[in-house]
Amino acid sequence: MTTAQAVGAVSSEATQWYAIDWPTINRNVRRLQVRIAQATKEGSWGKVRALQRLLTHSYSGKVLAVRRVTENTGKKTPGVDQEIWNTPEKKVQAVQALKRRGYQPQPLRRVYIPKSDGKTMRPLGIPTMKDRAQQALYLLALDPVVETTADKNSYGFRPQRSCADAIEQCFLALKSAKTAWILEGDIKSCFDRISHNWLLAHVPMDRAILQKWLKSGYMEKHVFHETTDGTPQGGIISPALSNCALDGLERLLKEKYPTGTRLRSLGGKYPSVNLIRYADDFVITGKTKELLEGEIKPLVEQFLRARGLELSPTKTIVTHVTQGFDFLGQNVRRYSNGKLLIKPSKKSVKHFLAGIRETIKAALGKSATDLINELNPKIRGWANYHRHVVSKRMFNRVDYSIFYKLWQWARRRHPNKDPRWLKQKYFERHRGRDWFFFGETWDEEGQPTKVRMLLASRIPIKRHVKVRSEANPYDPVYETYFEKREENHMLDTFRGTRTLRFLWYEQCGLCPACNTKITRITGWRLHHCVPRVMGGSRSVENRVLLHPECHNRVHDQRIAVSKPRLPSGGVRRA
């Protein structure tokens, strides 16, 4: 054993991984993605294929793909080979092994997870780490094409888009009293039935690689099963493939029913046809029930049939907006006073409270602090999801239901104690509100402190600003737009506000472009020194605050802005 080995010296491969210049890697990949998007926009498909090949064979692309699969939530979940890449040495070896020639994917490992109803199970196919990295690599080259050609109002599994955008588009499409009917579309086993032949003929990527993935099969209980159709849920590239299959439906409807064109069949009225899709869930608005059932539904069925898909006859229904419908966990309905309101759906509330009850029921032997630490992330996640709609009354009901279950938990935990003792032990008055559930713990310095239950009703309700339907994160034209959205998102979160304050202190309150004060009156804009479309990171090392006018000038004149020098004595974190 050498001296270096004895003291645990870092290997050459580990040194190689730690020495990677990630800003340069991101910049190289982003530049190619921007060029791919531009070539797609121009319809230069030969150039698209050449640039995709350049990206999938590049060192930067391979390194970024390996980093993605070793840093995401599934990094500790192995495939059929039971291998995970948890050391720098394995990551470097993985980069070197990512080659097209001789590549043969292994079967997927089939597992089952419960669906939202809690009764049925959803199959997932888990690829090996190598296959995941290969998919991540080819997704880097496919995603700019998919984003450029995607339907404008498709919101699922796309960068810079969310469920909140889809819900807000529902409101925009239905707020007019002229739009009264909705087709609720449900595609039967969408991911499991997409035609392989259609995907191979239409997905703009290396077809030989795609065919190997589609035909790789899966292992279940040590038995190999072939796959003849569908894209496995669990693969990194699967959401992009399903979006490829379903994109085009909105364009088809717009060609058939152009905006601003009256229909004779409707007595010269506008059809008011709009599609809002999130993955395989979609709704289509229309003027009349007859239009949706007699014309649009057959058109959708024909579109899906070519892709090996079909609508579920029992779950695909036409509903009047006054009856309301559920979409992505929200209920959309126009009430008798003419107002269109979106609220958390009863199903979503019931499912959430059932999970809370199970957590509390299983925590009889835990302390109040441990229980709060389990419940708070669940409450925060559910409330943040619904905080963009009319949720205040439902949040209060949820708070009461949780309080009632916590009181039962306290009584079961201390059956011989009277209610006054229980209240003093677990509940207190805080911020003007009584009966705040709390637990006692110690901070890092060993001092006693309290943790408190999060109340859903304390989450502020704020209207979501929908992303522009045509905005493309791979198009430099929208760089300023996405910077502004990110700034608004930061201001909307406690952590983000701290970051803005830190940047302000770091710059001594000065704009680096004009060297004058940034104040609330002057306003500010968040700027990336290295643009995001060129691979710049979101870290504070790549961000500065500029005046709005200075920000416009920097982008218009393409002026380079660098980070200001730190003030003497460093920067205090806000």
PLM ranges: what are they?
Residues T15-G74, L140-G156, K563:
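Charged boundary/loop elements
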Residues V66-V69, V95-K119, M129, A133-L142, ...:
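Reverse-transcriptase-like RNA-dependent polymerase core
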Residues K215, F224, R307-W382:
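A conserved non-catalytic segment of reverse transcriptases
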Residues D399-R495:
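Extended C-terminal regions of large enzymes
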Residues A471-A513, S537, K563-A574:
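Short, charged surface segments at domain edges that flank catalytic/cofactor-binding sites
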Residues N515-P548, V554-R565:
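Histidine-centered nuclease catalytic patch
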